[in-house]
């Protein structure tokens, strides 16, 4: 099992979570996160967060946030 899981969390305009994508590769997760760094993302989402969960320590860390 991988030590880290990277998550991209999409929050709808009404403030409710819409989707969570999970990745074991930070590089792939960052690439997917950056695909949404466009003005039209604001039409669907109020916020998109990129975070990391460390399974060894149980800690979560927000790495980047896009707020629209």
Model-derived features: positions:
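Solvent-exposed serine/threonine-rich low-complexity stretches and specific carbohydrate-binding patches
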Residues: 22-25, 66-68
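Surface-exposed loop/edge segments in extracytoplasmic proteins
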Residues: 15-21, 57-62
């Amino acid at each position: 099992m991988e030590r880290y899981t990277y998550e991209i969390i999409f929050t709808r305009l009404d403030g409710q979570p819409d989707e969570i994508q999970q990745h074991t590769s930070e590089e792939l997760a960052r690439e997917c996160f950056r695909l949404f760094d466009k003005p039209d993302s604001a039409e669907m989402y109020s916020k998109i967060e990129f975070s990391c969960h460390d399974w060894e320590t149980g800690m979560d860390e927000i790495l980047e946030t896009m707020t629209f």
